[in-house]
Amino acid sequence: MLVHPEAMSVGALADKIRKIENWPQKGILFHDITPVLQSAEYFRLLVDLLVYRYMDQKIDIVAGLDARGFIIGAALAYQLNVGFVPIRKKGKLPFETVSQSYALEYGEAAVEIHTDAVKPGSRVLLVDDLVATGGTMLAGLELIRKLGGEIVEAAAILEFTDLQGGKNIRASGAPLFTLLQNEGCMKG
């Protein structure tokens, strides 16, 4: 049973996100979504808000980014009655993969997807928990494109607007939807 999104406000989700100062390093204000996931009421609200947005958009598959994108994406795929594809950190998938690297503050990382995960022409929704610089989301979008998928939208719970990730994603040609926007994760 879906909870109608108007039954609770999106602001209620924002209130449920825990803020932790100086984690994982000094100067960062970490936004922890686990309280949303731990609450049946708020987790349902989160998923239902996304279901209502995408239920009429003819999604073929939901892809989720490692790791919290798995939780949200799998629940959303289930409700939309479509398959789920994990996009994992490099070296975590057992079958043949396609890889895409992205820049970190100090260095580089990569994500991978199975080569048979997205069929050419499939309409794909990419999901993660948040958008900061956009590097991971951009890498995921590129993987979907490499396999011939059509990006319906990239979606997240939270976007840190001052870090320009959303702007970078939109500049890549992908639409982006976030439930919440915040000025940033830098403590100051």
From Swiss-Prot:
Pathway: Purine metabolism; AMP biosynthesis via salvage pathway; AMP from adenine: step 1/1. Pfam families: Pribosyltran. InterPro entries: Ade_phspho_trans, PRibTrfase_dom, PRTase-like, UPRTase/APRTase. Its EC number is 2.4.2.7. One of its GO terms (cellular component) is cytoplasm. CDD domains: PRTases_typeI (cd06223). One of its GO terms (biological process) is adenine salvage. One of its GO terms (molecular function) is adenine binding. Keywords: Cytoplasm, Glycosyltransferase, Purine salvage, Transferase. It catalyses: AMP + diphosphate = 5-phospho-alpha-D-ribose 1-diphosphate + adenine. The keyword Cell membrane does not apply. Coiled coil: none annotated. Gene3D superfamilies: 3.40.50.2020. Catalyzes a salvage reaction resulting in the formation of AMP, that is energically less costly than de novo synthesis. HAMAP family: Aden_phosphoribosyltr. Homodimer. This is Adenine phosphoribosyltransferase.
